[in-house]
Amino acid sequence: MALINRLDSRDPGFKTALSQLLAFEAEQDESIDQAAAGILADVRRRGDAALLEYTQRFDRLAVDDATALEIPQADWHAALDSLPAAQRQALEAAAARVRAYHERQRGETWTYTEADGTMLGQQITALDRVGLYVPGGKAAYPSSVLMNAIPAKVAGVPELIMVTPTPDGVRNPIVLAAAAIAGVDRAFAIGGAQAVGALAYGTATVPAVDKIVGPGNAYVAAAKRRVFGTVGIDMIAGPSEILVICDGKTPADWIAMDLFSQAEHDELAQSILLCPDAAFLAEVEAAIERLLPGMPRADILRVSLANRGALILVRDLEEACAIANDIAPEHLEISTEQPQRWTALIRHAGAIFMGRYSSEALGDYCAGPNHVLPTSRTARFSSPLGVYDFQKRSSLIQVSREGAQTLGRIAAELALGEGLQAHAASAQYRLDQP
């Protein structure tokens, strides 16, 4: 079996082969969905008592009172102080860059006044309270804390509540340190669907939030789907994706490692290279074969590349851009000369990395833009997480007496046409001369 699929856009069956490669349907495991539904209903009904029970069952953490599940801020700062200097400096540098970028996204209230004195506008307000889910256990995701928490605080969210499971009572110090740096307000040692339920419905200990963001396992994803509508959610993310457009002049090892950077996430991750240079594709394939055995996650890489990876020969870079728009990838690298020229042709991508030195990994951690990106072709209609996800817009309408004379007649005419007499009368009552 080949290490990675090879496709040629000139082949008659190319479109079918590409569609099969891209096909991904999130597994709607009925047992997981039903388990999540049961946990949510129980947390909604029994509150803290259910939280304590599920935390003991799933995380083997037994406490007598739900208030003991809250992690004191002093512990976060102790975790921050205990980090190796280089790690702390890296976290703080990344946080500063993420904050600087997202401050440019902050929306502002605006108004304008018409000639008759009528004022119209839009008022921007932040959400009152947001919940942030951070996976726990052996894996540490401090970057997720930064990418989710900092935009919320830049948006002006007064209260940001983090939940993170602590299996066997073991807390992840780098996650707590990131919470201290990012401006999280409260943190609780809870996880799974029960944590989502606590954030959505509230308990005596955990306050209900307006929106839940952050990644999680299948149970967390199922729970987020079910509470959507009661609260807002960010998205239900699919497997990680990278698409690279290359002119054949970037070192092959660089491109191979860029493909690895997403393929190593899990077996369903997707890594694709588009290039008009057949010899370069062969170089990249050779680099993959040479570098892969030395990778710690080689087993995952092999499955991911064999099942969902591809090296695709295209006619030219214009065609590569057209294919990229059809794929609408989460991450798109344009590793070419004059990358701005090709970026102008891209309409659908979560994040675009321009030039040979802009590796996707830099965006994951510290470039500044958010790493929470649309997957599974949803970049056709959705955007990266940002400050705007934590702000709301309210329309402002202040009609002057003079304005009411004009607008009232228009509104009444339209309302009567729709058979809504009270609407019409409401407008007509304000007319000086009906």
Swiss-Prot record:
Binding site for NAD(+): 133, 194, 217
CDD domains the record matches: Histidinol_dh
Enzyme class: oxidoreductase
Residues given in the record as substrate binding sites: 240, 262, 265, 331, 364, 418, 423
Active site per database record: 330-331
Catalytic activity reported: L-histidinol + 2 NAD(+) + H2O = L-histidine + 2 NADH + 3 H(+)
Family annotation (SUPFAM superfamilies): ALDH-like
Cofactor binding mode and count: Binds 1 zinc ion per subunit.
Cellular component annotations (GO), alphabetically ordered: cytosol
Single GO MF annotation: NAD binding
Pfam families for the chain: Histidinol_dh
InterPro entries, per the entry: Ald_DH/histidinol_DH (IPR016161), Histidinol_DH_CS (IPR001692), Histidinol_DH_monofunct (IPR022695), Hstdl_DH (IPR012131)
Residues annotated as binding Zn(2+): 262, 265, 364, 423
Protein keywords: Amino-acid biosynthesis, Histidine biosynthesis, Metal-binding, NAD, Oxidoreductase, Zinc
Pathway linked to the protein: Amino-acid biosynthesis; L-histidine biosynthesis; L-histidine from 5-phospho-alpha-D-ribose 1-diphosphate: step 9/9
Superkingdom, natural source: Bacteria
Cofactor: Zn(2+)
EC number(s) from the headed UniProt entry: 1.1.1.23
Function, in words: Catalyzes the sequential NAD-dependent oxidations of L-histidinol to L-histidinaldehyde and then to L-histidine.
Family from the record: Belongs to the histidinol dehydrogenase family.
Protein name: Histidinol dehydrogenase
Organism, as annotated: Bordetella pertussis (strain Tohama I / ATCC BAA-589 / NCTC 13251)
Gene giving rise to this polypeptide: hisD
